[in-house]
């Protein structure tokens, strides 16, 4: 196996994600009483499960898991959800609900808690 294969795959994935994000506009303001669901990981993959529920300006995190790399990604230990959407809104997070104890649902919790260590956790 060529060690550069993993780097090329990671670079390709990063390029795809950047091109997707560049074409996204800001979400529309929520109507009063509306609920927004924001998937930050776990779509189209087994792992990295994380969703954020937004309601009346407050955020509830549901799961915060890791994705384990494939053989084509040497040197990568874990793949985390994309926290960038909530990094600037950590003060709006009212809690985190963990649905169960598998790594793909709880493995990234310590990394999120580095952004704000006093988030209440429910399970």
Give the label of every model feature segment:
Residues 1-38, 54-65:
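Metallo-beta-lactamase
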Residues 43-48, 55-98, 110-119, 123:
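Pre-active-site segment of Zn-dependent metallo-hydrolases
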Residues 105:
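N-terminal Rossmann-fold NAD(P) dinucleotide-binding loop
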């Amino acid at each position: 196996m060529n060690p550069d294969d993993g780097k090329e795959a990671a670079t390709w994935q990063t390029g795809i994600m950047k091109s997707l994000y560049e074409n996204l506009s800001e979400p529309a303001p929520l109507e009063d009483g509306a609920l927004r669901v924001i998937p930050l990981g776990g779509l189209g993959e087994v792992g990295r499960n994380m969703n954020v529920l937004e309601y009346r300006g407050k955020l509830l995190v549901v799961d915060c898991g890791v994705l384990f790399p494939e053989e084509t990604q040497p040197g990568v230990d874990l793949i985390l959800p994309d926290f960038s959407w909530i990094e600037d809104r950590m003060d709006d997070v009212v809690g985190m609900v963990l649905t169960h104890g598998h790594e793909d649902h709880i493995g990234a919790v310590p990394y999120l808690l580095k952004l704000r260590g006093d988030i209440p956790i429910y399970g």
